[in-house]
């Protein structure tokens, strides 16, 4: 009888612990990414790797990429909002 009660308690505590862990993982907020034109890039953006390097090194952005915005391709940097 004592082993059965102990087993039920262990099972209950294990399930409770799993629910708490999964709840924390499932509701982790996702950071929003903000985009803005590079303030240091000059001219038409042709190579996204160059844009990315400049955004990361000079503007402390997470990344950068070339995108078309009228009238030409521009370098855009991406930051955590």
Curated annotation (Swiss-Prot):
Keyword Transmembrane included in the entry's annotation: no
Gene3D superfamilies with a match to the protein in the record: Knottin, scorpion toxin-like (3.30.30.10)
Superkingdom of this protein's organism: Eukaryota
Keyword line: Antimicrobial, Disulfide bond, Fungicide, Signal
Signal peptide location: 1-31
GO biological process, one term: killing of cells of another organism
Pfam entry (one): Gamma-thionin
Bridged cysteine pairs (disulfide): 34-81, 45-66, 51-75, 55-77
InterPro entries linked to this entry: Defensin_plant, Scorpion_toxin-like, Scorpion_toxin-like_sf
SMART domains assigned: Knot1
Protein role: Antimicrobial peptide probably active against fungi like B.sorokiniana, F.oxysporum, F.graminearum, F.avenaceum, B.cinerea, P.beta, P.infestans and P.debaryanum.
Stated family: Belongs to the DEFL family.
Protein name: Antimicrobial peptide D2
Annotated source species: Stellaria media (Common chickweed)
